[in-house]
């Protein structure tokens, strides 16, 4: 593609050199640059791409997009100066890959909890309807039934647009995507055209990056502020920030709720460990999911599918066939009648939701034993809160390691224990080895009890000192049970 065609997507401050050159590819990683490519220098949280301009030129880059043109420009290289390289990168990438989001309906899901479940269930629902569908999520990316491994909730703009381009080439008609607060703040979704957006809820998370809940809220809200006029914004009225999210959007606003009058109204009629009986807009349906939070997730899926043009009755039929997402309230039964639940709950609110769901089914007929940790090099403020919430709603608590990353596991555990009082401590153990912690919970459990293993869910690794070691909560439980 000619450089001057690419530049139509942005408003450069200035261009020095030839803008009619052929660009063979676009890159933000100097190590991956090939001959004839455009290298785009971004200022990241860890490094500044401007420092790698010489390396990119050495690798064969013929054009450089940057905020500051080097003091000694290299002859024969075209320099494009922009005010905001973060914003420009997404727009350039989407243009280079043929504006893929104009070729299908793209729906983004944002919020603290429920993103993966809602995006994945929408993907499964529209595959049930017979469409070719794409999914971009924390667990895995899919182009129809072909899995593509994932590193972040939302990939960098180049990877993201390349993936969306593949989805368009493969004939996907719908794409469902988790949209993280990081990706909104870092403009990774700049240039994408959304057909709709869904807001789930907002509770404490990622404060290691956003610093304050207000900044975190602003990042989420920006997604809806930028939503186009002909798109829909579907927001959760049961969250106090539900209407805040959509107050400045140009899109059409719709609401869903389990508590209030809304466009999509739901309620739980019955709940047990095999599933729930629900009422959505005065239609009854039986589903294989547990917990109010899952009823809310399914209601969002129902609403979005209807807003994408499907009949309510057809959507309800599709929902009744769906299975829970990997690592999300994943139940395993032991031969002696103990139920273990593996769940990704890694925020205080998610933990409360899962524990409430367990108590809603148990109705006081069994003990709850919770195994929980907290991630290293992440928001330390939530650690004592996680432990306190676990203690409040459990008969026994075992504080253990999650992904310690570059921190000492015992120090993370100590941060968590600081949230407990003397009464809580009587029912709490701390075991740094996660496998031993799970084994201990299994030894303590009797027939009719429930063990919650929280925090890692679908993850099949434990990250220690920069190395990912194989570790799967579900595998460990099955091994102990059998």
Curated annotation (Swiss-Prot):
Its cellular-component GO annotations read: cytoplasm
Q: Which domain of life is it from?
A: Bacteria
Where does it localize?
Cytoplasm
Q: Which reaction does it catalyse?
A: UDP-N-acetyl-alpha-D-muramoyl-L-alanyl-D-glutamate + meso-2,6-diaminopimelate + ATP = UDP-N-acetyl-alpha-D-muramoyl-L-alanyl-gamma-D-glutamyl-meso-2,6-diaminopimelate + ADP + phosphate + H(+)
- The EC class name is ligase
Q: Which residues carry this modification: N6-carboxylysine?
A: 220
Q: Which family does it belong to?
A: Belongs to the MurCDEF family. MurE subfamily.
Protein's name according to its UniProt entry? UDP-N-acetylmuramoyl-L-alanyl-D-glutamate--2,6-diaminopimelate ligase
Q: Coding gene? A: murE
